[in-house]
Design a protein with these regions (language model features):
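C-terminal and late-domain segments of enzyme folds
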Residues: 2-3, 146-147, 156-232
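Conserved beta-strand scaffold positions in the cores of enzyme catalytic domains, especially
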Residues: 43-45, 120, 149, 188-190
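Structural motif
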Residues: 59-63, 95, 192
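Cysteine-nucleophile active-site neighborhood
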Residues: 67-140, 144
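Short, structured patches in soluble enzyme cores that scaffold and shape functional sites
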Residues: 122-125, 149-154
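Single conserved hydrophobic/aromatic residue that forms the stacking wall/gate
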Residues: 230-240
Length: 240
């Protein structure tokens, strides 16, 4: 099947609350890399109070926000937790960044109290003294090139044996000790990497698009568009 006959629908969850680190850049990257291939793409934004129908979505983005905003979002999402869980277990594609990453797990324990998580992945996060702030480079088996970004988080996330997004080559990662960053569960990626993540790492964007198309249409041959500018920017970050 020609990719020009395909369509991807991206759900951006709560951009009114979870857009602390420019997560709309991740949406823009996904859209562009679909359009460059002739794949029809649309983004639907779901803000507080909106009804979310996961059956109509191919990729879901959960961005980052403050602890207060995370608590508001989680309270809303817990009302449809079973639908979100079904989407994940059925292979639905999710990219969750920073606060969104923390919401995937069982809980986020902060100095102010406990934020209940969505329990979509068996992980948990606890706030500890000091923030982990630096450039970061990962070796991820999902893509061929190093994954680069910037991390800035006070929470330490523990994976309970789940697969990490990547091995830390430079930076702190999930907890500053394990040597790993992020989590991968089925077609879910959770990560602390900002940048935004996807414009800095177009291969990760293509991985998400590939998984979404395969879930919807079966086997797909995705030909990656080559962008010299993107590759040079990526190589510069990886060399830091």
């Amino acid at each position: 099947m020609d990719t020009k006959d395909m369509k991807i629908t991206i759900g951006h969850l709560y951009p009114d609350l979870l857009n602390l680190y420019g997560d709309r850049g991740n949406i823009a990257c996904l859209m562009k890399r679909c359009i460059w291939r002739g794949i029809e793409a649309e983004t639907i934004e779901f803000n507080t109070g909106d009804q979310i129908d996961f059956s109509k979505l191919d990729i879901v983005l959960l961005g980052g926000g403050s602890d207060r905003e995370q608590a508001i979002v989680c309270k809303s999402l817990l009302e449809i937790q079973s639908e979100f869980k079904d989407y994940v277990e059925d292979g639905g594609v999710v990219i969750a960044v920073c606060g969104g990453y923390q919401l995937l797990g069982k809980y986020y324990k902060t100095d102010a109290g406990m934020i209940e998580g969505l329990n979509l992945v068996d992980i948990y996060t606890e706030q500890e003294e000091g923030r982990l702030i630096d450039n970061i480079v990962l070796d991820s088996d999902l893509v061929d090139m190093p994954v680069v970004g910037f991390e800035n988080h006070g929470g330490r996330t523990y994976l309970n044996g789940n697969k990490p997004f990547g091995k830390v080559l430079y930076g702190a990662g999930n907890d500053g000790k394990s040597g790993y960053e992020g989590v991968v569960y089925k077609n879910v990626i959770g990560t602390y990497l900002h940048g935004p993540l996807l414009p800095k790492n177009p291969q990760v964007s293509d991985y998400l698009i590939q998984k979404a198309l395969e879930r919807k249409y079966g086997e797909v041959q995705l030909m990656p568009p080559v962008s010299y500018t993107h590759l040079r920017a990526h190589e510069t970050c990886a060399d830091l």
